[in-house]
């Protein structure tokens, strides 16, 4: 048999052997990178099983109920919303928030930039409608980092306290796309001032089955906020802020401001949410990733769009909901 006739069999044999070697290397790398997932799953489910049996056999254990959090006297709470070019959503967000929240003793502070005239107009329109709304002007052009806007909002909150003769027990961070649950402020009010940072889970609003990019975000956030953060809090005792649905106690904000020239949020960091969580942990502040089951009303279309929309009541943790991005560019 000539050498030419053996070329292709030898070539394909070597090619197949190389593919096998590459597959082994890739499999080993995937296995190594999956160890953390295996640890998280093992810790999470072991913890859940232990808690289930412990609390089931504890006659003194009573789950927290919505009625309990509603009974607590309302403290002053502030909501801060940084806004840059949010003119198309900010009014709807404010209207939805005011109509939804089952709470009276709160003030909303929206931070806008001097060169963002369309957002300013929308916020001013809402301010004339709702007495609990304040607009905070960042005195320089935007955009800047989120931390910069938040620091100006915090200064306005401190000034408002002096002028109104009140003290906010907690300050809650939200974005212009957030949809709140009616019991959110009641829940924060119940935990303050015992906890210094309270982080709620973040979940997506309903999406269609074919919105695949948004579906990837939904999967990632579901895994991160339903399991990973629970394990992280259990193992390390620290909780990072998610940038939305985060409540800071007055004590926490004053402590943060005291260490950074009266600017609680670090403008040198692009991940101010992680930064603030780590700084509070270093100060010995008490943080919690709060999981409190409540009822949500969801609406969705029927298969093939036939018939009226479906409305269901589902039980899931109290969370902040929003539409996650649905394009590759975002």
Specify the residue positions occupied by each region the protein language model found:
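Short hydrophobic helices that act as membrane-entry/anchoring signals
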Residues: 5, 9, 13-16, 33, ...
């Amino acid at each position: 048999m000539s050498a030419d006739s053996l070329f292709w069999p030898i070539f394909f044999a070597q090619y197949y052997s190389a593919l096998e070697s590459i597959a082994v290397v890739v499999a080993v790398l995937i296995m190594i990178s999956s160890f953390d997932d295996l640890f998280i799953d093992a810790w999470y489910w072991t913890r859940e099983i232990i808690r289930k049996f412990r609390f089931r056999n504890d006659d003194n254990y009573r789950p927290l109920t919505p009625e309990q959090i509603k009974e607590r006297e309302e403290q002053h709470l502030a909501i801060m919303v940084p806004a840059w070019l949010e003119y198309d959503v900010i009014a709807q967000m404010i209207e939805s928030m005011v109509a939804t929240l089952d709470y009276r003793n709160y003030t909303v502070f929206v931070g806008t930039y001097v060169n963002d005239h369309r957002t300013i107009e929308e916020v001013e329109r809402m301010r004339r409608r709702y007495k609990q709304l304040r607009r905070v002007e960042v005195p320089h052009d935007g955009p800047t980092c989120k931390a910069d806007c938040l620091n100006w909002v915090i200064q306005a909150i401190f000034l408002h306290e002096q002028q109104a003769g009140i003290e906010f027990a907690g300050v809650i961070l939200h974005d212009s796309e957030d949809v709140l649950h009616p019991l959110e402020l009641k829940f924060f009010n119940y935990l303050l001032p015992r906890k210094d940072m309270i982080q709620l889970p973040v979940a997506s609003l309903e999406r269609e089955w074919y919105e695949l990019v948004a579906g990837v975000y939904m999967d990632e956030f579901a895994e991160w906020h339903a399991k990973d953060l629970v394990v992280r809090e259990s193992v390390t005792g620290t909780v990072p802020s998610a940038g939305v649905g985060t409540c800071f106690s007055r004590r926490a904000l004053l402590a943060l401001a005291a260490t950074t020239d009266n600017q609680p949020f670090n403008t040198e960091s692009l991940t101010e949410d992680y930064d603030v969580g780590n700084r509070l942990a270093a100060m010995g502040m008490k943080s919690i990733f709060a999981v409190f089951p409540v009822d949500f009303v969801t609406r969705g279309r029927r298969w093939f769009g036939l018939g009226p929309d479906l409305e269901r009541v589902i039980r899931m943790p109290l969370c902040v909901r929003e539409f996650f991005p649905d394009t590759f560019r975002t």
